[in-house]
From Swiss-Prot:
Chain positions carrying an annotated carbohydrate: N184
Residue ranges, Extracellular side: 96-109, 174-188
Taxonomy of the source species: Eukaryota, Viridiplantae, Streptophyta, Embryophyta, Tracheophyta
Name of the protein in question: CASP-like protein 4B1
Organism the protein comes from: Sorghum bicolor
Cellular component GO terms, alphabetical: plasma membrane
């Protein structure tokens, strides 16, 4: 009985020693996020992703702006070249529309007026197209930048309005002729009116572009 008691006391002593030597688990304090920012790896990755998305959006907006400015810079040349081509075709159709007797364009003041305005539109559009082509090739614009946009805006509008007035004069008489007879003379005048209208559309679009540039022009 004494031996059993001694062994039990020895076992209890050994268990107490082992418990004393075992290091206690240190409870780590919970740290609150600083200024509400996430301290996890996922939070850092999300922040980097958000920064990357923002940078890509800025680059896309800059590229889109460059493309828009490049299109606005090249459009006057294309529009004036198109206006010159349509005006030239209208001019040729009217000038060559001579078939004798009453089928002579010069017997009608409406067609003479259309011929004169088509000639003016051709000369103006050619001059503007040549100026813009020279500028885009790196040459010096003969018109100062401060006055160039105003010149484009006013010139395009004036010539476009003149073309519209010529069309308004030529359309009624052509309709009356075609209601009575349809021949080469009336077909040629109708085709000339169509070409003059396309020239008007090109100059009207050019006036819109030049007006937009003029509204964005800075004077400081």
């Amino acid at each position: 009985m004494a031996m059993v008691t001694t062994e039990a006391a020895a076992a209890a002593t050994t268990a107490a020693t082992a418990a004393a030597e075992k290091p206690q688990d240190v409870e780590k304090p919970d740290y609150a996020p600083y200024n509400g920012a996430s301290t996890t790896a996922d939070g850092g990755t999300g922040a980097r992703a958000r920064r990357g998305d923002g940078g890509g959006g800025v680059v896309d907006s800059v590229v889109a702006r460059w493309r828009r400015e490049d299109m606005l810079d090249k459009s006057p040349l294309a529009l004036h070249a198109a206006a010159a081509i349509f005006a030239f075709v209208a001019l040729v159709l009217v000038a060559s529309n001579q078939h004798g007797d009453w089928m002579q364009f010069d017997r009608y003041q409406e067609y003479r007026y259309l011929l004169a305005i088509a000639s003016l539109a051709l000369l103006y559009s050619l001059a503007q197209a040549a100026r813009h082509a020279h500028r885009m090739r790196g040459g010096v614009d003969p018109v100062s930048s401060a006055s160039a946009r105003l010149l484009d805006f006013v010139g395009d509008q004036v010539v476009a309005y003149l073309l519209m007035s010529a069309l308004s004069a030529a359309v009624p008489i052509t309709n009356r002729m075609r209601s009575a007879v349809v021949n080469n003379f009336t077909d040629a005048t109708a085709a000339a009116i169509s070409m003059a209208f396309f020239s008007f559309v090109a100059l009207a679009l050019s006036a819109v572009v030049s007006g937009y540039k003029l509204s964005k022009q800075t004077y400081m």
